[in-house]
A protein has these predicted regions:
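C-terminal structural segment of proteins
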Residues: 1-164
């Protein structure tokens, strides 16, 4: 369905996108990362030289250190996956990112670029009520590009579209 393609196709611009790496985006744990949002929706792991294999959802919570990222692991799972984002301009950093997955009966929703590192939610249903509840519960902040209120509104819209 193109989850990873959709997550990387609009990265800032051609020049930056051609230099960006999946490992760099994940290891950096950047709040604006399209890639991190997508990988959190998947059954994914990182292998660290000293830290071993760590689930992606735990890795994003870890304190930054000088460990080395060896590889990114994605377990195969048939399912449905959607990635959506909103940008002020096509080549800008995302204002908000959303990824959802339904893989083997496990449903996940991820809200990223809030601003802040992407946040994972395990959900029971993919419906309008769940989209509205997540938009209300998720922690958002205002910054120079977007207000907290607009982020909440946008999260509800993007999650609703992704669930449809």
């Amino acid at each position: 369905e193109g989850l990873l393609h959709d997550a990387v196709c609009d990265i800032v611009g051609t020049q930056f996108r051609n230099l960006a790496t999946v490992g760099g985006s994940i290891f950096g744990r950047f709040g604006f990362s399209d890639v991190m949002t997508a990988f959190l929706a998947l059954d994914s792991y990182v292998e660290l030289y000293k830290g071993g294999i760590v689930q992606m959802s735990e890795f994003v919570k870890m304190k930054r250190d000088n460990d080395i990222l060896v590889r990114v692991i994605v377990k195969k799972c048939p399912g449905h996956f959607v990635y959506l984002s909103h940008r002020n301009t096509r080549t800008d950093f995302p204002v908000l990112t959303v990824a959802v997955s339904d893989c083997g009966g496990v449903k996940k929703a991820v809200i990223g670029a809030r601003p802040g590192i992407a946040k994972l939610y395990e959900i029971e249903r993919m419906d309008k009520e769940t989209a509205e509840r997540l938009a209300e519960e998720a922690p958002f902040q205002s910054n120079m590009r977007v207000s907290e209120a607009f982020c909440r509104h946008l999260a509800g819209l993007l999650l609703g579209r992704a669930f449809a």
